[in-house]
Every structure is written in C-alpha cells, then in structure tokens.
From Swiss-Prot:
Taxonomic source organism: Dictyostelium discoideum (Social amoeba)
Protein name: Putative uncharacterized transmembrane protein DDB_G0283807
Lineage of producing organism: Eukaryota, Amoebozoa, Evosea, Eumycetozoa, Dictyostelia
Principal subcellular localisation of the protein: membrane
Extracellular side: 25-78
Location of this chain's protein in the cell: Membrane
Amino acid sequence: MKIFKKVFLFILMITISFLNIVKSTEIDENNNNNNNNNSTSSSEKIIKGKEDEEELKNAFSSSVIPPTDHNSELRRKKVIASTITLFAFIILVLIVSIVVRHVLKKKKRTKNNFIFLDDQSLNDCNIELNVSSEYFCDENKLLTTHE
C-alpha cells in the first residue's frame, strides 16, 4: 500500500508541474501579444482600441475566445494533446498498479496453506487420514484443513 501511495504522489507531482508549464506558456503567449500591441503608433492604438472593444464584446458573448493567430491555435492544440496523453498515461499507471496489487493478493491467498504433519504429530492428534475430511488437533497441536 505504501508503494501505491508513493506512485500516486509521484504522478500527482508530475501532473501539477505539467499544468504549471502549460500555464506559463499561456502567460508567455499573452505577453507576446501585449508586446506586439505596444509596438503600434498612437493613431493605430486608438483604432485598435475600438477593434479590441468589439472583439471583447464578441468574446464575452461567446463561451470560447477565438485564437489571435494560427501559431497560438497550433500551440493550444499541442497543449491539449499533451494533456490528454499525460492523463491517459496516469490512468494506465493506476490500472496497472491496481492489477499488480490484485495479482499479488491472489498469489498470497493461493500459497500452500497445508502443514505437513510428521508421524508423531499424527499420533498425538489421533487423526485418520481421509482426503475429504478436516483434521483438527488440540489448541497446542498442529492444525490443517483441506480446502
């Protein structure tokens, strides 16, 4: 169980760091767009300001903000694809760990549970050997059952 917790925490740390990387690329993209807007002249800024207001109104009226250029759309698709891949990998690791844990538990249950009694133990318990029956001894003696 400790190994399962460690694997889960490791996957969680990877996911958080990945999401931080995605967030930082979005911030960098926004900064690049702002730098491009700042390089225009003052008359262009006024015209751009009116256009930006219209774009903002349109953007808020719809649920999805359209990308500004082809590169940002491509970058967004790459981020979405890598996020889906990461979560698919996490789900795969969780499934494999659950299956391995189940197999190990099953292996423990099916281990040889029989105690082989020597002649002295058999005489002490007064047991008749019969494959289909259960054999019991006193509390201080050995105990074995056929399952």
